[in-house]
Every structure is written in structure tokens, then in C-alpha cells.
């Protein structure tokens, strides 16, 4: 957010001049929302740390605020005249391809049109995620699956094709770009610097997305 971005010069930190396009009140709302949703993500991660009987302050090692790659997006989907993909599994028309996210959590607010589906890994069936104006959807990501050695699986999800325009607001809660993705972080007595930094882990993960393979 603005206050944090001003404190450091780094290629991974970007602060857009929102004041030029929207009013100051809206900028503050966006900045506050980012701060609160970031805190929520860290609280969720701390609850996982507790399962491994580790000190919850170790989360600060993962999510250094000035270095985090966490991203808040406003995804606007205009009227889709045709689906982006037809599922090979069940022939369903999709507005967003089947995938898992790269980070720790994706904390999502979806609009009334919905369309989000998640997959049960055991029976491979798809289930609708209903809209609830008082709730946020939390998907687990590939980074969390890696750090927990598969205990928390990345959520396989997709979005059904809808001819009507819609909007979703996902917050991708991700580690600092230089955090070492070591499986010993949660599973060992000490955190070892024997893994890829998250930047490289993310690059490898993104290459698995269909968009990067076209």
C-alpha cells in the first residue's frame, strides 16, 4: 500500500498514482482493505503454524511486509460471447480455466453472479461456491501445499461460463519474494535455507498456467 511503498525502493514494489484516477477517499478505502485482508491472511497462516507447534512469530519470516508479493486484484469480466475452454473432464463450458493458485491463500470476494466451482480431490466432482455477501472464500495455494508437504492441498477451481459481465476481487496472499521455500520451515526443528526463493518458485508455478503455454 502507499505508506509501505514509500519506504523502500525495490523492483518488486509498485505503487500506482491512484490519486490521478480516483478520489482520495477511494484510495484510502482500497489501502485500508489491503491492510485488513493482509492481516487476515497472516492470521490464517498463524493458525496453521500452531498445528506444527511452532512459534507464530515465525510468520514474520515469511511475510515481510515490504517484500511480500501479495496482490489485490479487481478482475472485471466483460460479456463473454464464447467460453475460454470446454472442460475435457465433463464437457462444461468455462469462463476461466481449471487451475490452482500459486501462493499461500487466495481470499476472494465474488459478486452475485457467482460461477466459482471447487473440486473434491477424492471423487473429482465439482461443487458450486454460493455467493454470500457476508463471507469471503479462501482457497489454499500451491505454496501452502509445498510448505506443508501436501497436508493442505492446493484448491483446484474453475469458473463457469456466463454471458453476463461480472467482477471478482481476489487477494493473493503470498510470501516475500526472497523467502526460502524450505519444507523444513514447518516440518523441521529449524528453518533451513535450502530451498528456492519464492520469486523463483512463483515463476515455475506460473509456467504451469494455460495462459503461459499458449
Language-model regions, residue ranges each:
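Peripheral, non-catalytic segments flanking oxidoreductase cores
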Residues: 1-214
Amino acid at each position: 500500500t502507499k505508506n509501505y511503498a514509500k519506504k523502500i525502493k525495490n523492483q518488486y514494489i509498485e505503487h500506482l498514482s491512484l490519486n490521478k484516477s480516483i478520489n482520495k477517499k477511494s484510495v484510502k478505502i482500497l489501502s485500508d482493505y489491503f491492510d485488513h485482508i493482509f492481516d487476515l491472511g497472516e492470521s490464517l497462516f498463524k493458525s496453521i503454524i500452531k498445528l506444527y507447534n511452532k512459534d507464530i512469530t515465525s510468520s514474520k519470516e515469511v511475510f515481510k511486509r515490504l517484500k511480500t508479493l501479495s496482490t489485490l486484484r479487481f478482475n472485471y469480466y466483460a460479456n463473454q460471447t464464447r467460453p475460454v475452454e470446454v472442460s475435457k473432464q465433463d464437457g462444461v463450458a468455462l469462463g476461466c480455466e481449471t487451475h490452482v493458485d500459486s501462493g499461500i491463500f487466495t481470499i476472494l470476494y465474488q459478486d452475485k453472479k457467482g460461477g466459482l466451482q471447487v473440486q473434491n480431490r477424492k471423487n473429482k466432482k465439482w461443487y458450486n461456491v454460493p455467493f454470500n455477501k457476508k463471507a469471503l472464500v479462501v482457497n489454499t495455494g500451491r505454496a501452502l501445499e509445498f510448505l506443508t508437504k501436501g497436508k493442505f492441498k492446493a484448491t483446484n477451481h474453475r469458473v463457469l461460463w456466463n454471458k453476463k459481465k461480472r467482477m471478482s476481487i481476489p487477494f493473493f496472499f503470498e510470501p516475500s519474494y526472497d523467502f526460502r521455500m524450505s519444507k523444513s520451515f514447518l516440518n523441521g526443528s529449524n528453518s533451513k535455507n535450502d530451498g528456492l526463493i519464492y520469486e523463483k518458485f512463483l515463476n515455475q508455478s506460473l509456467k504451469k498456467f494455460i495462459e503461459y503455454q499458449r
